[in-house]
Amino acid sequence: MSWRSESIWIEFITGSRKTSNFCWAFILFLGSLGFLLVGTSSYLGRNVISLFPSQQIIFFPQGIVMSFYGIAGLFISCYLWCTILWNVGSGYDLFDRKEGIVRIFRWGFPGKTRRIFLRFFMKDIQSIRIEVKEGVSARRVLYMEIRGQGAIPLIRTDENFTTREIEQKAAELAYFLRVPIEVF
């Protein structure tokens, strides 16, 4: 989602609050909870859940392994829910032609670098760079090349843009910033 005027362009970044992340966190939580309950029921020798009779799963080694997978899955699920709660990766890119300043803001993990804020002059922007790698794991990334700071990614790799959409966005941004486009 973006907002544009004659001299200002604001590009909003979604971050980790995506439908796919909610689905994965929920599925992982339920699956790992199931593994932990089956491991616990095999340890106790009673049916904690009535899907499997406890006599079919022996505690050593199946119950221990299922309990371990359940605990590990709960930790990973907790991590996913925390990234969703903190909305890690969300923010905005603000390009202001009137002031000649570019501001990039992202939310990070709690701590000293919770707020990631980059600010530089438009005259330091060398080019807009498109990096496209096709194949099994296709990767399309849009970078902004900054003099003295290297390349700063503007579009995340997990956003499923087609090559045409990336090219369109790069062309519009390069036209707005009045810089060339490089393709790799």
From Swiss-Prot:
One GO term (biological process): photosynthesis
Q: What is this protein called?
A: Photosystem I assembly protein Ycf4
Q: Name one GO cellular component term.
A: chloroplast thylakoid membrane
Recorded topology in the membrane:
Multi-pass membrane protein
Q: Which organism is it from?
A: Capsella bursa-pastoris (Shepherd's purse)
Its biological function?
A: Seems to be required for the assembly of the photosystem I complex.
Task: List the transmembrane segments.
Answer: 22-42, 57-77
> A Pfam family for this UniProt protein?
Ycf4
Q: Which InterPro entries match?
A: PSI_Ycf4_assembly (IPR003359)
